[in-house]
Design a protein with these regions (language model features):
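ABC ATPase C-loop
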Residues: 161-162
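Helical segment within the ABC ATPase nucleotide-binding domain
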Residues: 183-196
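Walker B catalytic motif
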Residues: 173-174
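Conserved structural motif at the start of ABC-family nucleotide-binding domains
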Residues: 4-6, 19
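Q-loop/switch helix immediately C-terminal to the Walker
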Residues: 88, 94-110
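ABC ATPase NBD Q-loop/coupling interface
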Residues: 61-77, 145
Length: 211
């Protein structure tokens, strides 16, 4: 059984049909790529997987780890192990990267009935993740995506991926707008995280990240 199964998915947004009968399997421990031109519904599919409230699934099912999540709330899907790196990450002025990451990590730990992460352990985990994604330590004291360049925003998404270690990561146009160096960091990060315990779905209209 695939980790994520999508069957005959029909999705509308503002009464307009965007996805018409999409079926897809995403296996655990594999990197999958979904390619297509702009406007073909790739981001709509990603948002439907995560339960975006602005979309309506009129037909079909989404199953994750054997459980039907078609009507599950976004936070419930996240707690189950789904993660999405957004094409256009939003800024959160006043909230530092460190605080944001610790809140996210503790939310996931709470969902597993685990104790909050100790500050010492969190700092060590953050430093290791930043080193892996080639992000300077000073980054943790900045406000989330506030004044970030395009490349920094994408690095922030990969940093979250490194900290949360989800079971399935959906990367929506993560390579969009990146220079060669930033693209390499993203690609290396994805390759290092994908493994037997995590599947990856890359949504893109470029072939370059696949090389």
């Amino acid at each position: 059984m695939a980790e994520l199964e999508i069957r005959n998915l029909h999705v509308t947004a503002e009464d307009k049909l965007i996805l018409n009968g999409v079926s897809l399997d995403v296996e655990m421990g594999a990197i999958h790529a979904l390619m297509g031109p702009n406007g073909s519904g790739k981001s709509t599919l990603a948002n439907a997987i995560m339960g975006h409230p602005g979309l309506e699934i009129t037909e079909g099912t989404i199953t994750f780890k054997g459980e039907n999540i078609t009507e599950a709330a976004p936070d419930e899907r996240s707690r189950m192990g789904l993660f999405m790196a957004f094409q256009y990450p939003v800024a959160i002025p006043g909230v530092t990267v460190a605080k944001y990451l610790r809140m996210a990590v503790n939310a996931h730990r709470e969902a597993k009935d685990e104790e909050p992460v100790k500050l010492k352990d969190f700092r060590k985990q953050t430093e290791e993740a930043m080193a892996l994604t080639n992000i300077p330590k000073e980054f943790s004291s900045r406000y989330v995506n506030d004044g970030f360049s395009g490349g920094e925003k994408k690095r922030m998404e990969i940093l979250q991926l490194a900290m949360l270690r989800p079971e399935l990561a959906v990367l929506d146009e993560t390579d969009s707008g990146l220079d060669i160096d930033a693209l390499r960091v993203v690609a290396e990060g994805v390759n290092s995280f994908a493994g037997p315990e995590m599947g990856v779905l890359i949504i893109t209209h470029y072939q370059r990240i696949l090389h």
